[in-house]
């Protein structure tokens, strides 16, 4: 279970953009064809909250010119599209949270006020002059309130994942905060995620129950799995196959298998198409690692040149754009840069 529900998509992006190697990208290659299943004005809207939101929006719009640049961490990328329903209102969809999580990726580059202004601009770029624009701004303020409330929890909500009691408390706390701050947006934002976490918790309780025999545990786990909706059960089966394949890839690499030998073995297990995708991803990953190493060496030279922080960051951003020209590459490089910086 994620320590912060609001951070989950950011963790997913870090796994995609970071240098996690073949095992992780193999999962992307194998299941890239599988569709994702995602779920005006939230229930219990308070006039005071709407008024505060309106003031904040007006201030942000007045303070930031339309020509303000994209944060370095998002250079070369674009925000997800905000969905609308048939009436032109903001659709209650998980995609709205994905949009805000995309914007939140820039938190390391921006102050809180600048981040608000950036979100205002991104919303206006898609919804300017529509009723959905005000709705999106309201949901953004609610989501920020949710994240702020999570941050007040002990250890920012971090919990021992092996302790069912602590996990249960954490789930209940997050669900309560989500409903209090997001109203009926809590279901599209976190409903599927919370269901999955409660399912995982139920599995953990069964596996840790010392009063059960192995046969009884297996029986209860099978019964629990049957409670899953059909699409969730299919998704879980895909995850299980993915994990098994990733374990197999790791073992093949550990044993020193050649690329051809790995492909032959994976073809037997996954089929020729998936094996070919894994092989291509391996080549792409090797190319990426080489280019990032060259870029990192040039970045280090810039960092050692004694430039002002503004000039240094500008030169590094320009270098990143020159080296990484494919969609998403510059964002991935920026994510790795931040990870390297936090490690020192």
From Swiss-Prot:
Keywords: Cell inner membrane, Cell membrane, Chaperone, Lipid degradation, Lipid metabolism, Membrane, Transmembrane, Transmembrane helix
UniProt xrefs under Pfam families: Lipase_chap
Transmembrane feature ranges: 14-34
Example GO BP: protein folding
Name of the protein in question: Lipase chaperone
Gene name linked to the record: lifO
Gene Ontology MF: a single term: unfolded protein binding
Lineage: superkingdom: Bacteria
Family: Belongs to the lipase chaperone family.
HAMAP family: Lipase_chap
Membrane topology: Single-pass membrane protein
Role description: May be involved in the folding of the extracellular lipase during its passage through the periplasm.
Signal peptide feature range: none
Subcellular compartments: Cell inner membrane
GO cellular component annotations of the record: plasma membrane
InterPro entries reported in the protein's UniProt record: Lipase_chaperone (IPR004961)
């Amino acid at each position: 279970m994620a320590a912060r529900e609001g951070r989950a998509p950011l963790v997913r992006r870090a796994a995609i953009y970071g240098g996690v190697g073949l095992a992780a990208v193999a999962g992307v290659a194998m299941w890239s064809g599988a569709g994702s299943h995602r779920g005006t004005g939230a229930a219990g809207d308070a006039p005071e909250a709407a008024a505060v939101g309106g003031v904040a929006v007006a201030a942000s719009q007045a303070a930031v010119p339309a020509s303000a640049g994209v944060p370095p961490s998002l250079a070369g990328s674009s925000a997800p599209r905000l969905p609308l329903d048939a009436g032109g209102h903001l659709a209650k969809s998980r995609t709205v949270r994905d949009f805000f999580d995309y914007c939140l990726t820039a938190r390391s580059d921006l102050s809180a006020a600048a981040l608000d202004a950036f979100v205002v601009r991104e919303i206006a770029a898609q919804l300017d002059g529509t009723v959905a624009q005000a709705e999106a701004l309201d949901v953004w303020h609610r989501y920020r309130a949710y994240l702020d409330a999570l941050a007040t929890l002990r250890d920012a909500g971090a919990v021992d994942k092996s302790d069912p009691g602590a996990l249960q408390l954490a789930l209940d706390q997050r669900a309560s905060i989500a409903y209090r701050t997001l109203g009926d947006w809590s279901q599209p934002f976190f409903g599927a995620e919370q269901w999955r976490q409660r399912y995982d918790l139920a599995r953990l309780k069964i596996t840790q129950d010392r009063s059960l025999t192995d046969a009884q545990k297996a029986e209860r786990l099978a019964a629990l799995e049957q409670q899953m909706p059909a699409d969730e059960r299919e998704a879980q089966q895909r995850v299980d196959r993915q994990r098994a394949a990733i374990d197999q890839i790791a073992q093949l690499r550990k044993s020193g298998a050649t690329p051809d030998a790995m492909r032959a073995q994976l073809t037997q297990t996954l089929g020729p198409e998936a094996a070919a995708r894994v092989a291509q991803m391996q080549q792409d990953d090797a190319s990426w690692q080489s280019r990032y190493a060259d870029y990192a060496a040039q970045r280090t030279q810039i960092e050692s040149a004694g430039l002002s922080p503004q000039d240094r960051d500008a030169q590094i951003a320009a270098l990143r754009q020159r080296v990484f020209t494919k969609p998403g590459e510059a964002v991935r490089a920026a994510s790795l840069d931040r990870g390297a910086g936090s490690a020192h």
